[in-house]
């Protein structure tokens, strides 16, 4: 099922074909460009990077924050997680969809919009109600006040997120609640379902309600929407657990591997029935660092385990905390991709068959680590991964991934995202009858 907004800021922002028809495929030749792109405006957690506490006391600053003091182009400068999706339209233009609008949005827009050629915002989609996803909405007045760039911006979110914004920022919902000089943003609100497709600017964006910690009384999960974009890229910015029913929904949109690593065969009985596409990339939260016991953010062990279950061709890590430099994350990713393991992993790989992925329960505790994994009298920094020594971090990263995933498998393509990185892919279905279901259609402007 899908949900189409009743209105849009521009007439070319929506396809007119009904969901389930073949009009979209037939119209493809009229589109000069079928390339969709996503630019990271932010890849840091809610505190962003660097931290004030680090840069104001350089002698005690962590490696990632210290690096930003001397390099204004440092990849360790990270805003709140979010980005911009660019979608080609039938008339040759591109629509711009803003994904989240957090506390650091204004600085990110000032930096990246001119460099990337962005200006108009055709729509904004929100993942959840936290400040790092919504507290930059007021800054969108620069686009709409006195119609500086556009008259209004359509905002798409779930009921829970809308209600939180209405309670905290009532003037964004109704100008009757405003005070002051009257410089207000102008929004067209769309309250969206969390279990149906959203069709925005001709692009299918499928929300998945994932857990982002458990709070409240009685205890219940805070929901953060993950977005499957074009059945090609899954954006998971804030997650602590993916319920099994959501894995079942994902399997309706993408070809997921079995536990032996094999993908589903083509459907029988029809030579024209299209296979589900293989996921091109997952953008995934590692805000928990190397933790195996996440509260509100998973860490690297869970992120790799989720990527394995998704069978994603590429994995981009995001939502970084301070403590470990971008280069150290990159060094681990490259070595992991080459199939390197810890010393324990080298021994384990010869003793048992390892499934491609495993399931786990929410709140499941990690296995007790071997004492051989730690130095004598380990420091708190070592157990969390915040350590000045890159080799200690890399070793511990291998160990935690191996412990949580239940064993060692050959490496995957994994890279740390950074602010300003752009990934792009050919729209799903360009091949005849979808025969490109498993081919790689994605690349970025920095990594190979």
Stretch-by-stretch model annotation:
Residues 103, 131, 240-241, 288, ...:
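Short, glycine/acidic-enriched loop or turn micro-motifs at the edges of active sites
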Residues 146-189, 383-393:
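Active-site neighborhood of divalent metal-dependent phosphoester bond hydrolases
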């Amino acid at each position: 099922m899908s949900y189409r907004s009743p209105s849009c800021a521009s007439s070319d922002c929506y396809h007119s074909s009904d969901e389930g028809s073949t009009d979209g495929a037939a119209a493809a030749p009229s589109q000069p460009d079928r390339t969709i792109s996503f630019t990271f405006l932010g890849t840091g957690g809610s505190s962003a990077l660097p931290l004030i506490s680090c840069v104001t006391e350089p002698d005690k600053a962590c490696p990632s924050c210290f690096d930003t003091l001397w390099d204004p182009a440092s990849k360790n400068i990270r805003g709140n997680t979010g980005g911009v999706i660019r979608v080609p339209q039938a008339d040759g233009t591109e629509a711009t969809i803003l994904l989240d609008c957090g506390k650091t949005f204004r600085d990110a827009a000032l930096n990246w919009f001119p460099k990337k050629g962005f200006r108009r915002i055709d729509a904004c989609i929100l993942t959840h109600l936290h400040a790092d996803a919504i507290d930059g909405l007021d800054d969108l007045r620069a686009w709409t006040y006195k119609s500086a760039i556009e008259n209004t911006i359509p905002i798409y979110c779930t009921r829970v997120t809308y209600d939180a914004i209405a309670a905290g920022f009532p003037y964004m919902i109704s100008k009757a609640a405003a005070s002051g000089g009257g410089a207000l943003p102008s929004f067209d609100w769309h309250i969206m379902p969390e279990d149906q497709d959203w069709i925005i600017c001709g692009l299918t964006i499928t929300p998945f309600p994932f857990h982002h910690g458990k709070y409240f009384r009685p205890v219940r999960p805070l929901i953060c929407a993950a977005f499957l974009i074009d059945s090609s890229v899954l954006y998971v910015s804030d997650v602590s657990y993916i319920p099994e029913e959501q894995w079942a929904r994902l399997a309706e949109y993408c070809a997921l591997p079995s536990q032996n690593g094999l993908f589903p065969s083509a459907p029988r009985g029809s030579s024209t029935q299209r296979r589900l596409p293989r996921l091109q990339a997952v953008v995934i939260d590692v805000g928990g660092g190397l933790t195996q016991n996440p509260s509100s953010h998973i860490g690297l062990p869970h992120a790799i385990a989720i990527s394995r279950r998704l069978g994603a061709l590429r994995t981009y890590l995001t939502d970084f905390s301070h403590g470990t430099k971008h280069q150290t994350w990159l060094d681990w990713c490259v070595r992991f991709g080459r199939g390197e393991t810890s010393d324990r992993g080298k021994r384990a790989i010869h003793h048992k068959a390892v499934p491609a992925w495993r399931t786990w329960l929410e709140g499941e505790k990690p296995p007790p680590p071997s004492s051989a994994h730690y130095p004598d009298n380990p420091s708190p920094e070592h157990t969390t991964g915040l350590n000045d020594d890159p080799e200690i971090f890399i070793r511990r990263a291998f160990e935690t991934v191996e412990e949580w995933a239940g064993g060692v498998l050959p490496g995957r393509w994994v890279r740390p995202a950074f602010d300003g990185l752009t990934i792009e892919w050919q729209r799903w279905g360009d091949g005849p009858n979808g025969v490109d279901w498993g081919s790689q259609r994605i690349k970025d402007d920095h990594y190979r």
